[in-house]
């Protein structure tokens, strides 16, 4: 569950900390939209759509990277933008031709690498830098608006990802366990953040804070969380191997239909 508290963050000035909170929430919900997608699903461009999910993820990374350069005052951001980001920035025919056949991990790593650069940049700046007036789009803007625009653009494309999901049969009609799972650390592993009262997960004994080391016999300790295909139809069971201070135990949870 993404954090909904916009507050101070260690290593960042107050306004920048809250900006990062909004960017982080946006990114987490973006990755939820493509949880467990295969390369074929990431490449699909249904009728009426201009971009694949992979193209949109590459675009998010490219937009964030070029705004790093712009907000840091680079004299030639276009010239400095790395060649591998141009297909994602341009999309169109170039994007359709070049952004194909890649696993979800490729996009996860690209997004994480760019985000690490953004956090390093923002950690070295302060709120006065964020608010400083400067020319933008033929008018006067500031870096606060630039970084707002970065995650505003991502939110728009997240909506497109959710529309693309409707064209993926394997992601329709999924049941729920009532457990909210999340990465354990740095995008890797699986942790149960919370369990809804009365849900199948609670009835099976799963608890918030449990570290999940295997799902259906597959070790997930070093897995990229968002690569894992966690969904399944109602009545389908999964066995979670849980690690607690007292040791490890297996808990079997059977999904139910989602409310409504």
Label every PLM stretch briefly:
Residues 90-131, 144-150:
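Acidic/histidine-rich alpha-helical segments that form the ligand environment
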């Amino acid at each position: 569950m993404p954090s909904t508290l916009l507050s101070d963050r260690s290593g960042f000035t107050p306004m920048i900390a809250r900006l990062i909170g909004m960017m982080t929430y946006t990114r987490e919900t973006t990755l939820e939209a493509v949880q467990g997608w295969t390369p074929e699903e990431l490449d699909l461009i249904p009728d009426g759509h201009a971009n694949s999910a992979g193209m949109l993820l590459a675009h998010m990374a490219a937009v964030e990277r070029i705004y790093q350069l712009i907000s840091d005052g680079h004299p030639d951001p276009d010239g400095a933008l790395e060649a591998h980001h141009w297909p994602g920035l341009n999309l169109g025919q170039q994007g359709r031709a070049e952004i194909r056949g890649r696993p979800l991990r490729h996009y996860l790593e690209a997004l994480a690498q760019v985000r690490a650069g953004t956090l390093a940049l923002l950690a070295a700046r302060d709120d006065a830098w964020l608010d400083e007036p400067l020319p933008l789009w033929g008018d006067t803007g500031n870096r606060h608006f630039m970084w707002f625009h970065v995650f505003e653009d991502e939110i728009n494309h997240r909506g497109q990802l959710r529309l693309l999901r409707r064209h993926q049969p394997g992601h329709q009609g999924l049941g729920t366990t009532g457990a909210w799972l999340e990465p354990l650390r740095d995008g890797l592993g699986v942790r149960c953040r919370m369990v809804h009262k009365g849900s199948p997960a609670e009835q099976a004994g799963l608890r918030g804070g449990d570290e999940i080391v295997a799902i259906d016999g597959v070790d997930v300790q070093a897995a990229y969380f968002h690569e894992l295909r966690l969904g399944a139809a109602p009545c389908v069971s999964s066995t979670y191997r849980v690690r607690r201070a007292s040791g490890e135990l297996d808990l079997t949870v059977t999904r139910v239909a989602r409310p409504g």
